[in-house]
Amino acid sequence: MQGAFTDNTNNTGSEKETNVVIVRYGELALKSPGVRNWYEKILMKNIAAMLDSKNIPYSLMRREWGRIFIETTDPRAAGAAADVFGVVSTSSALITKPELDSAAETCAFLGKKIIQEGESFAIRARRSGNHSFSSADIGRACGDAVWNMLESEGKHPKVNLGSPDREIFVEMRQNLAYVYLETVKGVGGLPLGTQGKMVVLMSGGLDSPVAAWLMMKRGVMIIPVYCNTSPYAENAAKERAYDCIRQLQTWASGHQFTTYEIPHGPNLRSFIEMCDRKNTCLLCKRMMYREAYEIMKKEGASGIITGSSLGQVASQTAANMHAEIYQLAIPIYHPLIAFDKSEIIDIARKIGTYDISTRSAGSCTAVPERPEVKANYDLIVLEEKRLDIENMVSEALKAAKVLKL
């Protein structure tokens, strides 16, 4: 069932309680009113697309100040919404009237279901809007209701505000109150699509998918580019890269990637045959940047993303990374520049690309035995003068494939 959007609710809570997912967001709330309104609308569309992609039904999606509410009975909804960029946390909750008695009754109902003999509990209450009672009043009323319910069940209630076995949360707003038991941590960041588009050089290894995901988390829609280095790489390398792109697509419901495959083998052959072998990797990367830059302009994007991490491999020295962009007026983003390998692996596991990226796909046979690690910038430019760089870029792009994976 497709849901509907509304900006507020006039529901007074007079109906039977229904299940709802509370969606919280972070830095969106710091934006100016106009920008915030725009971000929230995009976030709601992205959440709706994520729910639809997982066949999770909802009857209504609405927003109030600082919150988005999804009315649904599907237990998967909170987890799905938490995986949408821009969402800080979610909670599956019960709706009730914004009154002490109603909130207390709902807390007692949930407490009866979850609190076992010998377990301690605490009520965590907060409120917004105009009410004749304080958050402390909510806590006392709801705590008393749970205590009395437990005693009526023959249990021995215990309150522990510091480290309880069970917690019941109450969020009292102007028109409705919400009672819930847990919070699902979201991915955070900004809604996908709010920060334009960027090209990402996608190799299929551990690093580039993580770099792409981190920029998606900051609201950037990615355009994956795979430079096919065949015959210097196995076909398994291409399949691995494509599978990583497909996995990243699951984080971008409602946003279809446009993927480019560029034949890069002929250019590599030229570098090997006509230039100093130690510079092959540097020349290769500079060519990839040029090719990606042309796609960036074609797609109306505003930057190029790489998976480079300073010092991680011999070729990723500060000098080499400078040489890779020397005299190239191209905006390059390195989101992993200061990450340890262990941190990159942790994120890869989280986003679902680790098992793909660690599949055996062979190594690039064009890599020299002793690659340059401290490049001479001007020498690299002189190396390129031996080649018809402009024509090499043009021919590669003419043969590029445009894919919807």
From Swiss-Prot:
- Which Gene Ontology BP annotations are present? thiamine biosynthetic process; thiamine diphosphate biosynthetic process; thiazole biosynthetic process; tRNA 4-thiouridine biosynthesis
Pathways involved: Cofactor biosynthesis; thiamine diphosphate biosynthesis
Enzyme superclass (EC): transferase
Residues noted as binding ATP in the record, renumbered to the chain: L201, M202, K285, G307, Q316
Per its record, the protein catalyses:
[ThiI sulfur-carrier protein]-S-sulfanyl-L-cysteine + a uridine in tRNA + 2 reduced [2Fe-2S]-[ferredoxin] + ATP + H(+) = [ThiI sulfur-carrier protein]-L-cysteine + a 4-thiouridine in tRNA + 2 oxidized [2Fe-2S]-[ferredoxin] + AMP + diphosphate; [ThiS sulfur-carrier protein]-C-terminal Gly-Gly-AMP + S-sulfanyl-L-cysteinyl-[cysteine desulfurase] + AH2 = [ThiS sulfur-carrier protein]-C-terminal-Gly-aminoethanethioate + L-cysteinyl-[cysteine desulfurase] + A + AMP + 2 H(+)
Q: Which UniProt keywords apply?
A: ATP-binding, Cytoplasm, Nucleotide-binding, RNA-binding, Thiamine biosynthesis, Transferase, tRNA-binding
As for subcellular location, the record says:
Cytoplasm
GO-annotated molecular function = ATP binding; CCA tRNA nucleotidyltransferase activity; tRNA binding; tRNA-uracil-4 sulfurtransferase activity
Query: According to the UniProt entry, what is the EC number of this protein?
Result: 2.8.1.4
InterPro entries linked: Rossmann-like_a/b/a_fold, ThiI_AANH, ThiI_fer, ThiI_N, THUMP_dom, THUMP_ThiI, tRNA_STrfase, tRNA_sulfurtransferase_ThiI
Per UniProt, residues of the THUMP domain are 75-183
CDD domains hit by this protein: PPase_ThiI (cd01712), THUMP_ThiI (cd11716)
What Pfam families does its record include?
ThiI, ThiI_fer, THUMP
Entry's Gene Ontology cellular component terms:
cytosol
Q: Does the keyword tRNA processing apply?
A: no
Is Disulfide bond set as a keyword in this record? no
Q: Which family does it belong to?
A: Belongs to the ThiI family.
Protein task:
Catalyzes the ATP-dependent transfer of a sulfur to tRNA to produce 4-thiouridine in position 8 of tRNAs, which functions as a near-UV photosensor. Also catalyzes the transfer of sulfur to the sulfur carrier protein ThiS, forming ThiS-thiocarboxylate. This is a step in the synthesis of thiazole, in the thiamine biosynthesis pathway. The sulfur is donated as persulfide by IscS.
The protein in question is named Probable tRNA sulfurtransferase
Origin organism is: Methanosarcina mazei (strain ATCC BAA-159 / DSM 3647 / Goe1 / Go1 / JCM 11833 / OCM 88) (Methanosarcina frisia)
Tell me the gene name: thiI
